[in-house]
UniProtKB/Swiss-Prot annotation:
Has an adenine-nucleotide sandwich dimer structure in common with ParA ATPases. Nucleotide-binding forces changes that create an ATP-binding pocket. It is an enzyme of class 3 (hydrolase). One of its GO terms (cellular component) is cytoplasm. This is Maintenance of carboxysome distribution protein A.
Amino acid sequence: MKTLVIASLSGGQGKTTTAFFLGKLLSQSAKVLFIDADPQSNLTFFLGHEVEPSAPTLLELIKDMVEPADAVYSLANSNQFLIPSDDGLSNAQEYLASSGMGAVVLKARLKPLSEYFDYCIIDSPPARTQISIATIGAADQLLIPAEASTKGVNSLIRTLEIVQSLEKLGAFTGSILGVIPFRDKWFGLSQSKDSAGAIAAMKEVAPQLRIFPSILESERYKQALNQGILLSELGYPDLEKPFEGVKEALGIKQLVQI
């Protein structure tokens, strides 16, 4: 199982959007385990899962209260599975902080599941917390969405800083797959100056990293999320280019549409 963490240390950077559509695309040819590591639980909602009272979630998995398999739920698609979250996930902060091994706890908890799935997609929380540190520590590869704005550039910088600090401690042993610009604004065939400037700044901040095609500013993403479907199913396959680019980077050949 390859664990791909979607991380960016600010809100509104496209983490859940990226996790949802990338995981859906990968599940066309592989078994995918989604993990919602954000107490806001947006990924859980968009994937159509409702957490039942007393049902195991990521919190119970992190705290080693259940067997890993007991926190995994099957979704409508037979190749898609989910470890959900709810607002109780915030209670994991103290546990991770006091464990002395917070950065590696999630990686250890997921190890027994590795033989059952091809990919694990983790939607990380939007702040520098013990949970976000644990998700980064679990990553084989890290994908950083960043809004095509000054806020997005700052989020990229902060994310790279925490990755570097964890790498120095030996808590992050993976690699950074690249950056996906989010909410790239275009007016017809013309890109906005703010978006162009922000993406140029991203390239300056991280010249060694691959910049994937942008997630454009479009209501179509929200429509597809709300319906729980791919953009291609909505009739807008061109808007999936960022996620197809990530598939290519992962070494997965694009499926031929018949």
